[in-house]
Curated annotation (Swiss-Prot):
Gene: rps17e
Protein's recorded name: Small ribosomal subunit protein eS17
Annotated disulfide bonds: none
Keywords, comma-separated and alphabetical: Ribonucleoprotein, Ribosomal protein
Top-level division of the source organism's lineage: Archaea
Molecular function per GO: structural constituent of ribosome
Length: 63
């Protein structure tokens, strides 16, 4: 079983996908940079978790 993501991460990821859908791809490294550009995330681990969530959502949408 996988880890359950916090509501804050899910909510932020969903909002970023809605507003900036064209910036995100299925590549985690690119999404890290995109999250850093468009959102004011205070810590690196939080940025990485949000980028990971966005990456998973994009992969699901494209599958």
């Amino acid at each position: 079983m996988g880890r359950i993501r916090q509501t804050f991460i899910k909510r932020t990821g969903e909002e970023l996908i809605e507003k900036f859908a064209d910036k995100f791809t299925s590549d985690f490294e690119e999404n890290k940079k995109a999250v850093e550009e468009v959102a004011m995330i205070s810590t690196k681990p939080l940025r990485n978790r949000i980028a990971g969530y966005v990456t998973a959502k994009v992969k699901k949408m494209n599958a």
